[in-house]
A protein has these predicted regions:
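Repetitive helical segments and hydrophobic/amphipathic motifs
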Residues: 11-14
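Mitochondrial intermembrane space
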Residues: 3-6, 16, 21-231
Length: 231
């Protein structure tokens, strides 16, 4: 999907799915909401922050304008509570899906990661005209219903310490979920993730690992992932 406003496309590892498009970014919790509480045992140190608090960061986003009213209501709640409820988050994605269906797409499939984060599944490559139309439609529906909510939700579940450096945010997430050794560093992550052979010291197909990556703007897909049939 092409609507994410702050995500950065990951380096195309050799493991990335072939013959399908790579969508924008992006976990199942049992509670009705997720909160932006930091862990003091994440194994990370220092680092420039996006803002002093989630509330301040959301305020910065809202000050830039161009946020649809339905999403602004959800973001205003996040400013005061530090969370986005599961019901609000799923409603935003439901509205996006319906918007795309109304534009004539056969189906919109979502992948759910262990933290509750959703991303749209990849799809088989269409014609140049089809892909151009999809990009425009996805951006339009995303901007209207879910793009800003997605970015904030990703911060809450994947980067509660608000690190400005995406790699540091990923490593912090991996530490918090005990997915890498305590001595695993950002430098090591950057070296492994920029490689072309797909070799890493952790399981890249682990859904918790992928949740850490996707919530922080890295988009990783595999040939075995579910795909949607758009046309």
């Amino acid at each position: 999907m092409s609507f994410c406003k702050t995500c950065v496309l990951a380096v195309a590892l050799s493991m990335l799915l072939a013959g399908c498009s790579i969508n924008q970014d992006a976990t199942g919790t049992s509670s009705d909401s997720v909160t932006s509480e930091s862990s003091s045992e994440n194994g990370s140190t220092g680092g420039q922050k996006l803002a002093a608090s989630l509330s301040e960061w959301v305020e910065q986003r809202e000050s830039q304008g161009n946020i649809a009213e339905s999403q602004k209501t959800i973001l205003d709640k996040a400013k005061s509570t530090g969370e986005i409820s599961t019901s609000d988050y799923e409603k935003a994605w439901s509205d996006y899906r319906q918007c795309m269906i109304d534009k004539g797409y056969k189906e919109i499939k979502l992948i759910k990661y262990p933290s509750g984060l959703y991303v749209e599944a990849g799809h088989k490559q269409g014609t140049t005209i089809q892909e151009s139309r999809y990009s425009d439609d996805s951006t339009e529906c995303g901007d209207e219903y879910v793009a800003d909510v997605q970015d904030v939700y990703g911060i809450i579940v994947g980067n509660p310490n608000l690190y400005a450096d995406q790699a540091q945010a990923v490593v912090d997430c991996l530490h918090r979920d005990s997915l890498v050794p305590k001595d695993y560093t950002v430098s090591r992550f950057n070296k492994e993730f920029s490689g072309t052979d797909g070799n890493t010291s952790f399981d890249m197909q682990n859904l918790q690992v992928r949740s850490c990556l996707v919530s922080n703007g890295y988009n990783v897909g595999y040939a075995t992932d579910d795909t949607e049939q758009l046309w």
